[in-house]
């Protein structure tokens, strides 16, 4: 994808689904990644999830609130994005159940 880094590319992430992968797509660190400095932290999370990612990894606690706010804002404004988040949450919960981490009690 010449227009997007792989982490933000629906084309690249979509290849996983085309090849039959139906599991959770997890980012590398999006919070402190030097290679992504030019992208505002909130947009890093939004763009990864919009491209088809499921779970954002962030090693910089200073940008967590901004990432969460950015994702919430986009979800409120964009039904398709909100539906992607719902599907992502379902995949994450299914994985947790599969490995015995779903029940916290």
Summary of predicted features, one role per range:
Residues 77-104:
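Mid-to-C-terminal alpha-helical segments outside catalytic/metal-binding sites
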Residues 1-80:
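Second-shell residues forming the walls of enzyme active-site clefts
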């Amino acid at each position: 994808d010449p227009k997007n880094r792989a982490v933000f590319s629906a084309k690249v992430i979509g290849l996983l689904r085309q090849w039959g992968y139906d599991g959770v797509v997890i980012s590398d660190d999006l919070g402190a990644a030097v290679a992504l400095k030019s992208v505002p932290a909130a947009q890093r999370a939004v763009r990864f999830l919009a491209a088809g990612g499921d779970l954002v990894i962030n090693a910089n606690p200073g940008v967590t609130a901004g990432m969460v706010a950015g994702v919430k804002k986009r979800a409120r404004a964009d039904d398709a994005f909100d539906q992607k988040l719902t599907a992502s949450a379902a995949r994450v919960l299914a994985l947790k159940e599969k490995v015995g981490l779903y029940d916290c009690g």
